[in-house]
A protein has these predicted regions:
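N-terminal Rossmann-like or analogous alpha/beta NTP/dinucleotide-binding catalytic cores
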Residues: 2-124, 220-234, 249, 274
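A conserved active-site cap/scaffold subdomain adjacent to cofactor or substrate pockets
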Residues: 257, 261-277
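Short glycine-enriched loop/turn motifs at secondary-structure junctions
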Residues: 76-79, 207, 259
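Short, surface-exposed amphipathic charged segments that create phosphate/polyanion-binding patches used
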Residues: 97-100, 253-259
């Protein structure tokens, strides 16, 4: 029996919903409807410094205005909630501890100054910055001593030493990412907040998302997220990275091109049918 199609739209509540976001939501909604699947709305509020409390309501209002009703999510409920990412924080911590116990991740105690020195060295040597893994080599006793001293730490995901992640993108075709060029990225910040590339795939896996449809600016995040799916032992969804929207000057659509949010288009008198056509 085929796995039911489940897509999602996962905006961040950092402002008004951009027309590019609605375009992404439209593709996800259409794919779910075409395949008799379910369309999920999830709010990804991991960046607390950029969030606007009223943005969640504005996002929902904009989606409803253009006719994109969600089957699961805020206001609709569902079997795999909560659908607000910050309300799933305990689940993210649970997975982080699981990854630490399995050796898939490790604590890094490097200071901002030490990391800056590594970046400067990479720049002088004309090579991309990749974290040196100095904290990966710490013994259990050294880690315990640092913890006892109250040293701040982040959690990094351990990337395989060799090989590559090959993504069969539904839009771009096969894309290859060499593990040696990725580095061990941070999955939990020093304040305990999970990063986007950690929380996002955990939530997708828990919500049984089968198809991730999003902008091509997130393509480079994919190999890091695939490692999280693999660490969870969860199926890796199919990915489709859409071309971004550009203005007449061939630059990414922004305020300088005029109204770019759904709210602004609605207030300017545009019909919802014109926006999604």
């Amino acid at each position: 029996m085929a796995t039911p199609v489940r897509t999602r739209f996962a905006p961040s509540p950092t402002g008004l919903l951009h027309v590019g976001g609605v375009r992404t939501a439209l593709f996800s909604w259409l794919y779910a409807r075409h395949n008799g699947g379910r369309f999920v709305l999830r709010i990804e509020d991991t960046d607390e410094t950029r969030e606007h409390p009223e943005a969640i309501e504005q996002i929902q209002r904009s989606l409803r205005w253009v006719g994109l009703e969600w089957d699961e999510g805020p206001g609709a409920g569902g079997d795999f909630g909560p659908y607000i990412q910050s309300e799933r924080r305990e689940r993210h911590r649970e997975v982080a501890e699981q990854f630490l116990a399995q050796g898939l991740a490790y604590r890094c105690y490097c200071t901002p100054e030490e990391l800056a020195a590594e970046r400067e060295a990479a720049q002088r040597e004309n090579r991309p910055f990749i974290y040196s893994r100095r904290c990966l080599a710490l013994s259990a006793e050294e880690r315990a001593a640092r913890e006892a001293a109250g040293e701040s730490s982040v959690i990094r995901l351990r990337t395989p030493d060799e090989g590559a992640c090959v993504v069969d993108d539904l839009v771009r075709g096969q894309v290859r990412f060499e593990y040696g060029q990725l580095g061990d990225h941070v999955i939990v910040r020093s304040d305990g907040v999970p990063t986007y590339n950690f929380a996002n795939p955990i939530d997708d896996a828990d919500m049984h998302i089968t198809h991730v449809i999003r902008g091509e600016d997130l393509l480079s995040s994919t190999p890091r997220q695939v490692l999280v799916y693999q660490g969870l032992g969860a199926p890796v969804p199919s990915f489709a990275h859409l071309p971004l929207l550009f203005g007449p000057d061939r630059k990414r659509l922004s305020k300088r091109h005029g109204a770019t949010s759904v709210e602004e288009l609605r207030e300017a008198g545009y019909l919802a049918e014109a926006v999604v056509n």
